[in-house]
Amino acid sequence: MELVKICPEIGIVMDVDTGIVAEMRKDILVVDLNPIKEEINKLETLSKAFENSLDPRSAPLKAYDGRDNIYSVGGLFQSAFFGFWISLSILTLGLILVIGLYPKLIGL
C-alpha cells in the first residue's frame, strides 16, 4: 500500500493501489501489511513442512522426486547406528568387568 502526498500542507493523499484521494488524519497510523503477510506465508509453509515431517511416509519440503519414505529409512539407519555403538559400549564394559573379576582368564 503506497500513499502519494498530493498536498502535504492540508494533508491530502492518494492511495496508489485503489486511486482513492482522501484526507490524511493525524490520529490514524497507516501500516503496510504486505511484508508481514509474506513472512506469515513463509512461516505457514515451514510449519506445514514440519508437521509433515512427523509422518514417515511424507517427503521433506525441498526434496527430489522419489524421496517419499526418507524419514522411515533415516529412522532405520539411526536406530542401527545407535544400537551398534550402545551394544559395543556394553560389550566393552562387560569385558572390562570380566577381566577385573577374573584376571587369570588373560594370564595375569
UniProtKB/Swiss-Prot annotation:
Assembly and binders: The complex is composed of 8 subunits; MtrA, MtrB, MtrC, MtrD, MtrE, MtrF, MtrG and MtrH.
Pathway(s) the chain acts in: One-carbon metabolism; methanogenesis from CO(2); methyl-coenzyme M from 5,10-methylene-5,6,7,8-tetrahydromethanopterin: step 2/2
A Gene Ontology BP annotation from the UniProt entry: one-carbon metabolic process
Catalytic activity: 5-methyl-5,6,7,8-tetrahydromethanopterin + coenzyme M + 2 Na(+)(in) = 5,6,7,8-tetrahydromethanopterin + methyl-coenzyme M + 2 Na(+)(out)
Main location, first listed in the record: membrane
Keyword field contains Glycoprotein: no
Protein name according to UniProt: Tetrahydromethanopterin S-methyltransferase subunit B
Residues passing through the membrane, by range: 81-101
Species classification: Archaea, Methanobacteriati, Methanobacteriota, Methanomada group, Methanococci
Topology with respect to the bilayer: Single-pass membrane protein
Entry keyword Translocase: yes
Xref: Pfam families: MtrB
Similarity comment: Belongs to the MtrB family.
